[in-house]
Amino acid sequence: MTRRNNPELNDEREPIDKIKASIDLKKKTIRRNKRKRRLIKMLQFLIVIGVLIGIYYFDKSDASRVHNVRVNGNVILSDAEIKDALNIHENQRIYLTFKPFINHKGKKVKGIDNIDANVYYRQGIINLNVTEKKAVGYTLEPSIRIYFEDGFYKELETLNPSVIERLPLLVGFTEESISESLLSALATIDDGSMASVSEIHFEPTKVEPDYMRIVMNNDYFVFTNVETLPQLNKYATIISGADSNARCIEFIEYGPTEETQSAVVKACGS
């Protein structure tokens, strides 16, 4: 006999089968998503490991290092002094070296006015274009020192004629008398007038504790204090109309401005 399906039972099983199929599909989807997430995490982990390994080997390679530091424009400060002040040396990691940081740090170095750095990462080269502060004088005693306008000085073991050829020799000064105001006043003197100065002797008096006698290289003498020292910029004009026998020039101050200052040219000893 042929067995007949009960339509009512079939109708009851259909929703159950659909629910079961839906549950199975969801389980498969969840398992598939889990596998996908695990795969993505594994790929991310491998990428991170690969990047770290790449960074490690790059850091160990010559390509990551500074091969050459070139210092240009410095006259008095040595290459080594500038490198040490900036903490930049060969064989350092060049990818940790940035131009803005070098330029900013350079402004804080004594004796340096400005640094314009260029970093060539592929070649491993750092160029330091240096502008020094203006040098305004030098001493021989108690030691050889070159003084800059910002108050910084550099000591030298031996005298370099090319460095001091246009600088005045400071004679009789103590560390206290080489004040910031003196160095600032010397910095205002133009190069042409400064080149005419041979020596500056510190000869204080009771009335003027910062009095100086300046020996010019054309047999003239200038007497001044710190306040009137900038009048030396008018030196060429002053002597152009002076009597050839009048070799002593005294800067006189009537007030705090250049308009209230004057120069008297007279025979020495008069």
Swiss-Prot record:
Record keywords, A-Z: Cell cycle, Cell division, Cell membrane, Membrane, Transmembrane, Transmembrane helix
Keyword presence, Amino-acid biosynthesis: no
Keyword hit for Cell division: yes
Segments in the Cytoplasmic topological domain: 1-38
Main localization category: membrane
GO cellular component, one term: cell division site
Ranges annotated as spanning the membrane: 39-59
Domain POTRA stretches: 64-135
Source taxon at top rank: Bacteria
InterPro entries xrefs: DivIB (IPR026580), FtsQ_DivIB (IPR050487), POTRA (IPR034746)
Extracellular side: 60-270
UniProt topology in membrane: Single-pass type II membrane protein
Cell compartments where the protein resides: Cell membrane
Functional note: Cell division protein that may be involved in stabilizing or promoting the assembly of the division complex.
PANTHER family: CELL DIVISION PROTEIN DIVIB, CELL DIVISION PROTEIN FTSQ
Family, per entry: Belongs to the FtsQ/DivIB family. DivIB subfamily.
Designated name of the protein: Cell division protein DivIB
Gene giving rise to this polypeptide: divIB
